Amino acid sequence: MYNKKYVIPLILVFLIGFFTPYWYNAMAGTLGHVPTLKEPAGNCVEDKDWMAANHMLLLQQWRTQAIRHGAEGGGIYHSFTTGEEYHASTNTCWSCHDSKEEFCDQCHDYVGIHPECWDCHYTPSVEKPHYSGIEELSKYFS
């Protein structure tokens, strides 16, 4: 190596610059802005801490019931927390959590994930299209 006296300090400066944000956050001991969610009225299907950790598993279970086992519109979900029975559908969630932007997106953006659920499914804040193409096809295939 011809320019050791320049290369080694440059590598050290790069490493220090790269790791400074990590060291700063480790020393400060803060997480930054943690989102605060609007508490909906009533009870959720399960308790708040369980839902924060496992809501995706619950939604996947409901999806499996609807798609693979033919429970159209979802089946019946028996809550372990309240003992009540709920309709296993995202519409059950939307009855309390009426804004995807104010509820779902805040936490998902905070942890840096982008679920693909909403590429196909509608949310309460999105207007459903009125034209599905079926009317057009029924003219030709009646």
Curated annotation (Swiss-Prot):
SUPFAM superfamilies: Multiheme cytochromes (SSF48695). One of its GO terms (cellular component) is plasma membrane. Coiled coil: none annotated. Heme 1 binds at residues 93, 96-97. It comes from the Archaea. InterPro entries: DsrJ, Multihaem_cyt_sf. Binds 3 heme groups per subunit. The chain crosses the membrane at residues 7-27. Residues 1-6 are cytoplasmic. Keywords: Cell membrane, Electron transport, Heme, Iron, Membrane, Metal-binding, Oxidoreductase, Transmembrane, Transmembrane helix, Transport. Heme 3 binds at residues 117, 120-121. NCBIfam families: cytoc_DsrJ (NF038038). Has menaquinol-oxidizing activity. HmeA, HmeB and HmeE subunits may together catalyze electron transfer from menaquinol to cytochrome c. Consists of five subunits: an integral membrane subunit, a cytochrome b-like subunit, a cytochrome c subunit and two iron-sulfur subunits. This is Hdr-like menaquinol oxidoreductase cytochrome c subunit. It comes from Archaeoglobus fulgidus (strain ATCC 49558 / DSM 4304 / JCM 9628 / NBRC 100126 / VC-16).
